[in-house]
Amino acid sequence: MYDVIIIGAGPIGLACGIEAKKAGLDYLVIDKGCLVNSIYNYPLNMTFFSTSDRLEIGEVPFISHGNKPNRFEALEYYRRVASSWALNLKLYEKVTQVDQTGEGFRLVTERGAYDTKTIVLATGFYDYPYMMNVPGEDLPKVKHYYDEPHPYFGQKVMVVGAANSAVDVALETYRKGADVTMVIREPALLDSVKYWVKPDIENRIKEGSIKAYFNSEIVEIRKYEADIMTPEGPKTLQNDFVLAMTGYKPNFDLMQSMGIGFHDDEFHTPIFNADTQQTNVEGIYLAGVVCGGLKTNKWFIENSRTHAEVVMQSIKNG
């Protein structure tokens, strides 16, 4: 039986594994995807907002070419962290069920089962996109993740969303030769759009280089076109790809199945003790961005790295 199983092999999950090892705990880090799966799914040319030192874990220095590292450098860094600490990892193994036992918990996965005294959920949010729930969303042309602009050259691309991701995708695909239309539920772009980018997208929309439908939603998607509802009524647009940058959310289903409760607030914030990170279920802890519920801009790598030590000290002290 493990002392602790950490679900999620992102930066905070790895930090938890490191702190568990330092505390002398018998631990396992398990993830349904690859190492730092969320970072792997970032756009290929993405640069972090944070400087490299703020992304460091486990006393392993993060040296990047620029002041702020890119995706490639981050993947290299976290591989180096996992290797240098020889972390006990099981990747590409999805947890399908968690049951309480007399001594703790049993985690059932696609490959087997593991017994543990405690659990840390460090599952982040990037693996679970908000779905539009419209006919045709399951077509191959619909993407909830964006990697690079090249495939969209010369294509009619519909970008859904009003926040930073949607704006970045619209501008980048437009500049690489796509015919871009934005579909935005809100009456305007969100105030959270980066201040140095907002004038660019507003000017492109104003001049007509990028078309934008505000107060509008996608109704149905077909192979070569998409229906949208606008304030002026329904419209059918020719379309090759839909890039749904609608945001992401934590895996609430997993938390609820484990008995974790939630506050009655707009962010569906999970219940946990901020001093120990322990949830309302004794023996189950939260770490990282998952702590914020739907407020996914509250916790980042740089301000939640400390969760790992707090959790492991709480577990060690019983």
What name fits each language-model region?
Residues 2, 9-87, 167-195, 264-265:
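Beta1-alpha1 glycine-rich phosphate/pyrophosphate-binding loop at the start
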Residues 123-176, 266-275:
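Glycine-rich dinucleotide-binding loop and its adjacent helix/turn
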Residues 5-7, 114-126, 160, 238-247:
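Short hydrophobic core segments
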